[in-house]
From Swiss-Prot:
Belongs to the universal ribosomal protein uL2 family. Keywords: Ribonucleoprotein, Ribosomal protein, RNA-binding, rRNA-binding. Part of the 50S ribosomal subunit. Forms a bridge to the 30S subunit in the 70S ribosome. Residues 1-21, 200-241 are annotated as: Disordered. Disulfide bonds: none annotated. Residues 1-12 have a biased composition (Basic residues). Coiled coil: none annotated. NCBIfam families: PRK09612.1. GO terms for cellular component: cytosolic large ribosomal subunit. This is Large ribosomal subunit protein uL2.
Length: 241
């Protein structure tokens, strides 16, 4: 009997293939939108800036005046002991979070809520930002890093500034081991071995005196998991002519 495929082992979810979430610093979410934020602003102080293995951007720990502690995505140029604010009366300054209706047009923003109160879903990778194009009483239009224009509720919150850690993709990994550990922290595969390069016990396409599948590579949609590799339920194969 052959061995299970990597896709089968990953699906089982053993520790080998799980992300080490116990090392992550925590969730990045805006605080509940209460009367403090809807009528004024709440100030806090940055007490720590940390690296989070599960993210590409640095994370800052903020202690607010009311005793709450929250993790936020650090913007560029944020420093320890710097003051940040959240609420409708907060200043338009990097690190401060406000509703889109209170942010001037053309301002770079990040960690944007998709729906009011969801805590922030859009534009959270290092070095990224969106631009607020326009807003009125009914909707706010932002330009995402991809260039797509998206209309949102003007009560959705966002943080002013650019996410710290820019230029990350310009620095090469140089070594396969560095790439392995970077992806391993998030539970991702670092390398993909071809089936024809494996032994017959490891993959349906493995074995033989040369590298070839040895059988048709198209398989049924209803094939069992150990045989479901190659072109799954393909309508056609080969070059388009």
């Amino acid at each position: 009997m052959g061995k299970r495929l990597i896709s089968q082992r990953r699906g089982r979810g053993t520790p080998t293939y799980r992300s080490a979430s116990h090392r992550f610093k925590g969730k990045i979410k805006y605080r509940a939108y209460d009367s403090i934020e809807s009528e004024g602003s709440l100030k806090g102080k940055v007490v720590d800036i940390m690296h989070d293995p599960g993210r590409t951007a640095p994370v800052a720990r903020v202690k607010f005046e009311n005793g709450e502690e929250r993790l936020i995505l650090a913007p560029e140029a944020l420093m320890l002991n710097e003051e940040v604010e959240c609420g409708v009366k907060a200043r338009v300054k990097p690190g401060n979070s406000l509703p889109l209706s209170e942010i001037p047009e053309g301002t770079p923003i990040y960690n944007i809520e998709n729906r009011p109160g969801d805590g922030g879903k859009l534009v959270r990778s290092s070095g990224t930002y969106a631009s607020l194009i326009t807003h009125d009483a009914d909707k706010a239009v932002i330009e995402l890093p991809s260039g797509e224009l998206k209309a949102l509720n003007p009560q959705c919150r966002a943080t002013v500034g650019v996410v710290a850690g820019g230029g990350r993709r310009e620095k090469p990994f140089l070594k396969a081991g560095k790439k392995y550990h970077a992806l391993r922290a998030k539970g991702k595969k670092s390398v993909t071995v071809r089936g024809v390069a494996m032994n017959a016990v490891d993959h349906p396409h493995g074995g033989g005196n040369r590298q070839h599948p040895g059988r048709p590579t198209t398989v049924s949609r209803h094939a069992p998991p150990g045989r479901k590799v190659g072109s799954i339920a393909a309508r056609r194969t080969g070059k388009r002519r």
